[in-house]
Amino acid sequence: MQKLSEEMKQTIMDIFEHLHANPEVSWKEYETTSFLKQKLEDLGCRTRTFSDCTGVVGEIGSGSPVVAVRADIDALWQEVNGTFRANHSCGHDSHMTMALGTLMLLKKQPELPKGTIRFIFQPAEEKGGGALKMIEEGVLDDIDYLYGVHVRPIQETQNGRCAPSILHGSSQHIEGTIIGEEAHGARPHLGKNSIEIAAFLVHKLGLIHIDPQIPHTVKMTKLQAGGESSNIIPGKASFSLDLRAQTNEAMEALIAETERACEAAAAAFGAKIELHKEHSLPAATQNKEAEAIMAEAITEIIGAERLDDPLVTTGGEDFHFYAVKVPNLKTTMLGLGCGLQPGLHHPHMTFDRNAMFTGIHILANAVLKTFQKAESLAAANAS
């Protein structure tokens, strides 16, 4: 496989600088989509955009198999140096850059194998709905293999090392309402204090126990109750719960136990607790075939001594909706060690930008290896 030239590296770094300097939040990645579309077309891709959402898809080649590379494109809204603004603190600017760089590198190869290479620039990963929208739009219908990439913090792996898959956990966000009864502060026995009910619920949540061998947590992350007056016992409160589990099965059990805890807390006070499940993310589903291809690609580029085992992380990622919702799709996500610190989603997150070149070489190698595997299988079946 041909490698990136110094001229290509500079072009790739320029792309990153532009994307890094122009972050846009979920579902509002308008300029980002336009920029990516132009770059894809400049590189000879057929492109597709969507009438009711951001994001863009580009592809080269034709026929099967269809191998795809996915990059998320949205930024986070967070406080940076005292000002709230969009900020690429989850590395999506680097993911977009690596996907475009992979396309550039593949186009430089003397010959590409028969088949289609698709590049999916997906919106709204941070909101958890972008992957589902791409599935709804039929972007994944004919894909055989799908590869993603995510930069990893130093707490997980060192700069210069890579993992063939990232095993994210499942997450579930729940909004709840406590309906008690207001009363005068001097007559608490006539009311049902929603703050006391919430405190009891926090205690009940802490008593939830499922299989201890599977990492899991449930906690209240937001509580709002009462108004301007401190002498009124609040009858109503709203709260948020954040649930995490390393497997989808454990998440189902955790949700059931959480619902039981809420029922018990409400019954103890003769109150009501209403729950509304908001966005959720599935845990990763390991595909050994795609993972093995990625491991081979990593080994050829940086050596077996720098190949990590699959990374297990409690974070969530909507990339895994693709494996759950699309039958027979083979997926894996490259975990790129890049010296990222102090951590993902930190407003001042930094990483070694030269690591993107490693990611590009690995992704391009994985794509080529996938086609080679398909050709070998077809030849074996023909004989």
Curated annotation (Swiss-Prot):
Keyword Hydrolase: yes
Enzyme's top EC category: hydrolase
Pfam family, one: Peptidase_M20
UniProt keyword annotation of Cell cycle present: no
Gene Ontology molecular-function annotations: hydrolase activity
Lineage: superkingdom: Bacteria
Keywords on record: Hydrolase
EC number: 3.5.1.-
Family: Belongs to the peptidase M20 family.
Database matches in PANTHER family: AMIDOHYDROLASE AMHX, PEPTIDASE M20 FAMILY MEMBER
Protein name: Amidohydrolase AmhX
Organism name: Bacillus subtilis (strain 168)
Name of encoding gene: amhX
